[in-house]
Amino acid sequence: MSSKQIQKAGDNSVNVQGDKVTIVTGLTYQEVRQVALDVFQQNFYQLAGVAADTARDRAEQITDKFLKELESRNPEGLAAATDPDFLYSLFTAQREHARAGDDELGDILVDLLVDRTKEQSRTLIRIVLNESLRVVSQLTSDQIAVLSLIFTLRYTKSYGIHNTKSFSKYLKTRIAPYIQGLPETYAALQHLDFTGCCSISIGSVPLENLVAGRYPGLFSKGIPQEELADMQIEEPIVNKLLLPCVRDRAKLQIKSINEDALRNQATELGVSDDTVKKLVKLDKSHRLKGDNLWKEIDAMEPQLADLRKKWQSLRLGHVSLTSVGIAIGHANVRRVTGESSPLSIWIN
């Protein structure tokens, strides 16, 4: 079987033969909208009656959402309408939203598309985003919740946490939103592995390490001053790294929220690395652990008790994300929280 295709080029246009796509340069938002809808109409399988109307309405809906978000986040991205690869990605998003009609999926597709307009050359991020647009429609909302939760816990660190109040806010706004949406069975995790969003390893990361271990300065029981004296630290300036323990004023604790911050402050003060190692070792032996730790965390955000159960039953500690899983998790985090850190922090 053969087919004959005839190209007709008008002013300011670039024709791409194969899968009916015509790209026109120098377009307005309204013209780009029409090009996008024409691409959908020409490439989506033909339906009849109500199904056709529904598919067209959904395609228009996601196209309008995309253009509105593009105008807000990346107005220069309008030039992507001249890129055949991007138009194919846009059609992928239209097609999947037309089939599913799911608002959550639509919002994630839009976020991925806007990020895609920022990649003019064939970068790794561009390849990852193209694949993410194809894969995300194969996932359920609870599987997407897994990606966002693992992304937040394993691949991000909040620099706005300085005390228990800000930590409590972090739990409520960055962790809790995904807990009730987690799947009930391990099969959901196996499907994430199958779609290339994650890998499941033999080794496991304890939830305690990810929730509290990133911010140990909040969970010190205090270092007895006699133990500090026994270390025979010969640098008096080390006292500037310590403060009275919030749980026991007769004891001391490291002033910094975590080890990275401690090392930065020690460098500024000229404290030796050997002394820092001694302080960290001593501090680790006087932190809240186990039930005592979770009692405090549960008081800040009760849903963490549910997360501990799911962490075990779903074996979430064994899950690490691929680049595609990170991109989808990142897009959903932005949808849920409004956070806007660039994807290039994790994929470059």
Protein language model regions, located:
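A short, conserved structural fragment
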Residues: 186-204
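Functionally critical alpha/beta secondary-structure elements and their flanking flexible loops
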Residues: 65-84, 91-93
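Long, low-complexity intrinsically disordered regions enriched in small/polar
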Residues: 1-49
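Extended, charge-enriched "interface" segments that sit outside catalytic cores
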Residues: 59, 63
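Long, low-complexity, charged/polar intrinsically disordered regions in eukaryotic proteins
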Residues: 82-137, 145
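Short, amphipathic alpha-helical interaction segments positioned at domain boundaries
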Residues: 209-342
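Short helix-coil junctions and helix-kink-helix linkers
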Residues: 166-183
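Winged-helix-like regulatory helical subdomains adjacent to P-loop NTPase cores
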Residues: 124-165, 175
